[in-house]
């Protein structure tokens, strides 16, 4: 049965405030799962199970699947599609409020458009060892972007600091119900071995990108004494990930000294 048929069968009305669009083509779901290269002993977290197209393909791998879905109105569809898979746990709750995501889990998700930014931050916070995520094409460009490009900014830096990223493939808007206004892209994220405090780091990155066209000297004005002798004439969008980490470490050490 097609996703659209399930929606009709249960009289599901899409909730605009949740930005609901559902993947309707199982070929795309199969390709995503193939890229994830899951093993039966893996623990997989899906954020936004929707109508279960991707969830069902994840279940077929034999891995333990924890599928989050904020809309309990989709329960009849998900329960019908997934009842034969004992390895699937449905959690009808907001992933952003989750408190017990398993360690060393893998995230495989079609990220809900309306909360992409907060969810990407949560993926970093939970330190998933790998993530295969489908996002809006424009968001994917920001995740993958390099210094000097218009799309390079806060999201590029926080994701690439903690993960190696690469583009896997594009997904046309025609593969969704209803058709969104934009195309999507599937991105792979592999965790790096870095020891950086994420909440503190994202605060610093947000600060240096607060006025994107201004120089570091302008955006770091309250902390200029900390960066004495450091060239702050460039803009944050011109800096590599490594250069930003160096600046962050100077700022972090200064904060630690001031608290002693």
UniProtKB/Swiss-Prot annotation:
Pfam families: RrnaAD (PF00398). GO terms for molecular function: 16S rRNA (adenine(1518)-N(6)/adenine(1519)-N(6))-dimethyltransferase activity; RNA binding. S-adenosyl-L-methionine binds at residues 23, 48, 69, 94, 110. InterPro entries: KsgA/Erm, rRNA_Ade_diMease-like_C, rRNA_Ade_Mease_Trfase_CS, rRNA_Ade_methylase_Trfase_N, rRNA_adenine_dimethylase, SAM-dependent_MTases_sf. It catalyses: adenosine(1518)/adenosine(1519) in 16S rRNA + 4 S-adenosyl-L-methionine = N(6)-dimethyladenosine(1518)/N(6)-dimethyladenosine(1519) in 16S rRNA + 4 S-adenosyl-L-homocysteine + 4 H(+). It comes from the Bacteria. Disulfide bonds: none annotated. It is found in: Cytoplasm. One of its GO terms (cellular component) is cytosol. Its EC number is 2.1.1.182. PROSITE patterns: RRNA_A_DIMETH, SAM_RNA_A_N6_MT. Its main location: cytoplasm. Keywords: Cytoplasm, Methyltransferase, RNA-binding, rRNA processing, S-adenosyl-L-methionine, Transferase. HAMAP family: 16SrRNA_methyltr_A. Specifically dimethylates two adjacent adenosines (A1518 and A1519) in the loop of a conserved hairpin near the 3'-end of 16S rRNA in the 30S particle. May play a critical role in biogenesis of 30S subunits. Belongs to the class I-like SAM-binding methyltransferase superfamily. rRNA adenine N(6)-methyltransferase family. RsmA subfamily. NCBIfam families: ksgA. This is Ribosomal RNA small subunit methyltransferase A. It comes from Thermotoga neapolitana (strain ATCC 49049 / DSM 4359 / NBRC 107923 / NS-E). The lineage of its organism: Bacteria, Thermotogati, Thermotogota, Thermotogae, Thermotogales. The gene is rsmA.
